[in-house]
Amino acid sequence: MDSPPLANVLTLGVQNIDSERAFYAALGWPVVFDSDEFVVFELRGALLALFPAHQLAVDARAAAEPRQGGIRSAVIIAASEPDEVDHWVGRARQAGATVTKPPTTAQFFEGRDAYFADPEGNYWEVAWAPADNPVTAAALRAAGLSQS
């Protein structure tokens, strides 16, 4: 129990499961489970689960937080090369995302990044950084894509 936990399933509480399902399917992400209640997409090294926000609140025994707009968190898509940032932002735009920061030179690290929000305002950052970046190296190790 001294090693870090396996945390590779991201659950987003959503208001409209049908529109969110359609958005992520339009990105080309494969569905591994689908029902009227929730849907799970497979990503490289992780799963994305979309679950009704009110049911997520019940399951967590917490209050459902009302959406106020703005950004509070973002999930990062780790790009393998700089051009992949443009690729995913283009796919997201075609699927109906709002691109809030077009692909550009990153401000806070050496690399390239962009941001988009899905139809319900869940933010994603698409980022590329050189392999010698310590966060990139750790992300590759965490996904089982690096031996170092």
Task: Give residue ranges: language-model regions.
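Vicinal oxygen chelate
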Residues: 1-9, 27-82, 86-117, 130-148
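Residues within well-ordered beta-strands of beta-sheet-rich folds
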Residues: 11-13
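Amphipathic alpha-helical segments
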Residues: 15-30
